[in-house]
Amino acid sequence: MKEVRQLAEGIRCFSEEKKPEMENFLASLVNRESGSYDTEDVNALGDFLVKVCTEMGGSVTRHRSRVHADPIACTFGCKDNPDARRILLVCHRDTVFPHGTTKTRPYTEDEKNCYGPGCADMKGGIAIGIYAIRLLQTIGESVPVEIIFTSDEEIGSEASEEFVKCRAKNAKAAFFLEPARANGALVTGRNGGDLLTLTVKGHSSHAGNAFEDGVSAVHGIARVITQMAELSDTPAGYSTNVGLVSGGEGAIVVADHAQARIYTRFSTLEQREFLLSRFKAICEANTQGGLKVSISAPVGFLPFLPNEANHQLFELVKVAGNAFGLSLTGVNVRGAADAGITSCAGVPTICGMGIVGGNLHTDREYAVKASLPERLNVLALSIVLANRTYA
């Protein structure tokens, strides 16, 4: 068994040699469209990644989704024992950017950073995950590892959540390759979040001649969303944002329909249940006088909570970082992501193991080029150490 110092040296040699190749691979990923709602694009990127992983000797599992693009898992080092416990690497291949973005804003770079849609969130993480597996194969470290490419993380993981839960059943540990913070910090905790659709139905009428015959869904939804927004308690760690409202046909028509999109943020599962129960009560209380008020089932993210198992994995990652002269730190963030899926399932989990970057979800998104080999080093050594640590 190689010592940590010997392993680190072999890993460093690989990453330094492959840095230009990795940058080219990242550029090819960024220039492939994969907006969350563009199913064909996200599946096409999935096809490309399946080809890459198959050529590396991976075994592919693909779930055909009826709601969004397909989540995919590629497994390595498990052919002799398909049920072997393995290390999970989890990436999402969708971005927030719609089809056509790469034509007007393709991958570019300067001396320090690279730019382009999803370069940090999270195509940089995909590149690091793929090359971590290649690295381990090259240096002769036989580790059962599975890389998951989810399809819809940016819109709530409706197609991917159950897939990740299922794949986590045989997991020793899970590394989520979301970008590290701009200062290089890893992510050791995240809020949960839900997306919901509020629907109000009323009765239309002429707003002048027959105003009293109508039941306004727009007036109704105004009351309901005000009551829901008032549930927010930011110091306690939960909030309700009504981000999109629509309804009605025109100013001279009493509206018979209205709809709102709501995003909740919460720190604990108990807070999530509180918000959902209050939403239900508000809908029931306002279903009267000809109004019908309903809210959809939540689609979103479980909270990624700090716990002892996750802390131990973070300490292991810090050991890996120290081997390359890095003093890694961890932060809890408000933004939700998929790490809560494995953490809530009892799998030691850490997030932010991808490329260092910032200005996510904007046309100014960037990734730090020097962090590509740097974070590859940390991930590869962390995989080996986790495989040795967890039975």
Which ranges hold each PLM region?
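Acidic/His- and Gly-rich active-site-bordering loop/insert found
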Residues: 2-117, 138, 321, 339
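Short glycine-aspartate micro-motif
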Residues: 86-88, 114, 172-176, 197, ...
